[in-house]
Structure formats: C-alpha cells, structure tokens
C-alpha cells in the first residue's frame, strides 16, 4: 500500500464504506442501533469482501441487534433514496468470536473501554490501523480490535500501567530499567518518526521479572502514541546490538514485543533498525524471522556504522554513541515532588471524563449521519473532523488526572498539541482531493 493510503485523509470510496461498516458493528456492540437515529428504517451501503482473497461482496443493512443470537444478523429494508446495495446477493456475517469477547462487558462498559483505547488518537485513524492490518477484511479487523480491547483492559490493564508508571513503588524492576536507560525515545528519523532505542546489552536474562519487562514495553508504546505528531502515525525502533552476547538474548520479551506490534499496535512500526549486530546474531535472526509477518520482515534494516545509519536518520539526530555529532545522553530525571497530585483529584477526573464522554456521544451521533448519508456529506464530514479534534483536546485536558508524569514529561517531550491539522478526503471520480482544515486546540 502506498505511503499515506488508507488514512483518514486519503480513503477510496470502498475503503470509506468498510470503515462505515466497522463503525456500524461497533455501535451494535455498544447497544446503539442506527434505528434510534430516526423512526424510519435505513439501509447502510457497505462492501464486506476482502478484495485480496475473494470476489464475493456482501451487503450490510440496519436492524435491531439481538443479544441472544449467536451472530449479528443484518437484514435489508428500504427507505427512498437512502436504500443502496452493491449487488443482489446478501449474506449474514458470522461474528461469534467477536460476540463472545464482547459478552465480557455490558454494552456501555464496552463503549467506555473503546473510548479509553482511542486515547489521544483520531477514532477513525485507530480503526483504520486494524482494517489495513487485515487487508480491509472488516470481520477480521473487528475481531482483532476486540481482542485488543480485551487485552488492554483484562490482561495488561494498560490504564493502570500508565497511571502509575515510574511512581509504582512496588515494581522496582520497572523503575530500575528506566534508570539505566534500557530503552528510550529520542529524536526523529528521516520521515519525522520518533525513534525508540533499545540497548540490548543492558538486558540480562533473569535480572528483572518478565512481568516488569512486559509492563515497560507497553508503557513505552503508549508513551510513543503521545509523542507522535499528526499526520505521523508510526515510530522507528533501533536495536543497539553493541557489545551484545548470548547472555543478553531473551526470547520471551522479544516474542511479547512482536505480539504487541502485530496484534495490538498494528501499523505502528515504521522501520526496525538492527545496529552493529555481531556474527552470532545471524542464528538468532533466522529464528526471529520465522516468527514475523513478511510485512514486518520487510521493515527490518541492518546497519553497521554511522554511515549506514545516515540512510535512515539525519546526522543531527544521530547520537555520539553511534558515531554521530549529537551530544545528547540519556539520563533519568527522578519524579518531581507533588507531580502526581492531579492523580488524586477524583472530582476533577470525573468532571473531565464526563466532558470527554459528551463529545464522544456527539461524535457518535454525527458518525451515524455519516453512515446513513443523512444531510450534506461535506458538512457532516467537517463536523466529524472537528469533533475528532475536540476529543483529542478533551483527552489532553484529562491527561494529568489519569496518567502519571514520566521521564518524557520531565524532559518536555510530551505536551498537548496546540492545533491539529486535519485532512478531509473527498473522492471525486475515483481520485482523492485533499483539503487542509486547521482546528485550534483548547487543551491546556
């Protein structure tokens, strides 16, 4: 897929329809039926087939959602010019696995988990990551996304990780890894993507608990989301293999990281640079390569020296320890006194969550108009983009009440975006015309 394709600002008509379909399913899982939007019945235009593997197409239409069924049954009806279909063949779409995951929550609880997962992202942008990762197969993308919601809330408890971070006194291993700089984020690559460095030599098997390594991995990935500057959506990882030996090789954490990128943070990896790998790493790489998706393998680059690194990172962003001119060195600033006070302010947190949720509900309402083609579509899309920007603002207003300040806050690398440049895609005769819309943020 070309760079920038399949993003909120650059969708084909078919891709937009698949995004609408995914939203439609999510609404049903949230207990929101499209029929609540009006007293009439509507048919939603969609195309569910995975073009890369099947030529058959399917049609999705609105009906009430029955929890007792073992599938989402979607049947057609008509309402004037709103009735549309791609072909004459309709088919029920089996989503038993998705419904099984969703059954762990009541509909409103699932909706809350969804918006927590959106975090500071554009909601469309987040869903599109999963659609691209599953080659626009809506059913597969929805299952992947629901597994991620389960993983975030029931397995890893991501909210608790970011809420405590290096203030988590009981997890000394977590803080120890931050202090030594086992991994850190610094600078950008040539595509303006943030770069995360992992110093393999600083990891010793058994030195810290596997759980703390997993927590650190998730924390870094969540932190990178906050550092990304739209429209940049991916980050680059540099594995610094300087002085690497087999005592540093730990397959468990590596498998966990791969799982995170491939299953829960799809389309987040820009490039993976393996720097100064010794000859003994060849055997290790042959094993690791067999675990990776071919798309991920294509993103892995090997460098030996400063000259090689310059292919991917501009010289002014290459640190002295890699032969570059930049003198910056990682040091760990300890937590500041009283910097976690906002986390104790329950009333402020409740109030700001309520404000964010009110905007989310407005976004859902306008999204239903978009799905059903209600009103002037240019105006509806504009409203959605503005509300998406307001959701980002609302997240940043809430941020200090739900996320512990981190080393990157103390360094000044994490700060609310003061404005968001949004791209609205308008397909015309198969071509995408991009228009820039700047929305000023009110986040403080």
From Swiss-Prot:
Gene3D superfamilies linked to this entry: CRAL-TRIO lipid binding domain (3.40.525.10)
Keywords: Phosphoprotein
Modified residues (Phosphothreonine): 43, 418
UniProt keyword Nucleus present: no
GO biological process: intermembrane phospholipid transfer; phospholipid transport
SUPFAM superfamilies: CRAL/TRIO domain, CRAL/TRIO N-terminal domain
Transmembrane segments: none
CRAL-TRIO domain sequence ranges: 171-330
Disulphides: none
Gene Ontology MF term list: phosphatidylinositol transfer activity
CDD domains reported for this sequence: SEC14
InterPro entries reported for this sequence: CRAL-TRIO_dom, CRAL-TRIO_dom_sf, CRAL/TRIO_N_dom, CRAL/TRIO_N_dom_sf, PITP/CRAL-TRIO
Record flagged with keyword Phosphoprotein: yes
Phosphoserine PTM positions: 40, 81
GO cellular component: cytoplasm
The protein's name: CRAL-TRIO domain-containing protein C3H8.02
The organism of origin for this protein: Schizosaccharomyces pombe (strain 972 / ATCC 24843) (Fission yeast)
């Amino acid at each position: 897929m070309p760079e920038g394709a399949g993003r909120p600002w650059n969708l084909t008509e078919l891709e937009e329809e698949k995004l609408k379909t995914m939203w439609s399913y999510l609404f049903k899982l949230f207990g929101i039926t499209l029929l609540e939007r009006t007293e009439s019945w509507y048919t939603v235009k969609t195309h569910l087939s995975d073009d890369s593997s099947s030529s058959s197409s399917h049609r999705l239409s609105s009906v009430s959602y029955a929890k007792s069924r073992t599938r989402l049954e979607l049947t057609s009806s008509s309402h004037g010019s709103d009735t549309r279909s791609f072909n004459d063949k309709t088919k029920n779409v089996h989503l038993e696995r998705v419904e099984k995951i969703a059954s762990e929550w009541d509909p409103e609880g699932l909706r809350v988990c969804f918006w927590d997962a959106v975090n500071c992202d554009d909601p469309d942008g987040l869903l599109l990551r999963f659609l691209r990762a599953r080659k626009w197969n809506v059913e597969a993308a929805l299952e992947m996304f629901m597994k991620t919601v389960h993983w975030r809330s029931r397995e890893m408890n991501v909210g608790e990780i970011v809420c405590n971070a290096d203030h988590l006194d009981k997890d000394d291993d977590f803080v120890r890894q931050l202090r030594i700089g086992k991994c850190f984020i610094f600078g950008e690559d040539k595509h303006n993507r943030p770069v995360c460095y992992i110093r393999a030599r600083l990891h010793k098997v058994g030195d810290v608990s596997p759980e703390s390594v997993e927590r650190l991995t998730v924390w870094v990935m969540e932190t990178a989301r906050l550092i990304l500057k739209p429209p940049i959506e991916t980050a680059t990882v540099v594995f610094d293999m300087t002085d690497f030996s087999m005592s540093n090789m730990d397959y468990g954490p590596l498998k966990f990281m791969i799982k995170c990128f491939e299953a829960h943070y799809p389309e987040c990896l820009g490039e993976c640079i393996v720097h100064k790998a010794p000859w003994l790493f060849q055997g290790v790489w042959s094993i690791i390569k067999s675990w990776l998706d071919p798309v991920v393998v294509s993103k892995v680059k090997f460098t030996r020296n400063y000259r090689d690194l310059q292919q991917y990172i501009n010289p002014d962003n290459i640190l002295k320890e890699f032969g570059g001119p930049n003198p910056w060195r990682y040091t760990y600033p300890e937590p500041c006194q009283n910097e976690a006070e906002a986390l104790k302010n329950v009333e402020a947190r409740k109030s700001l969550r309520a404000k964010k949720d009110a905007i989310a509900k407005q976004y859902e309402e306008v999204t239903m108009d978009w799905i059903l083609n209600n009103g002037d579509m240019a105006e509806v899309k504009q409203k959605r983009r503005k509300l998406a920007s307001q959701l980002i603002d609302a997240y940043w207003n809430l941020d200090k009440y739900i996320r512990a300040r981190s080393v990157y806050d103390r360094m000044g690398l994490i700060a609310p975006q003061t404005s968001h440049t949004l791209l609205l895609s308008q397909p015309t005769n198969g071509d995408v015309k991009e228009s820039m819309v700047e929305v000023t943020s009110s986040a403080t």
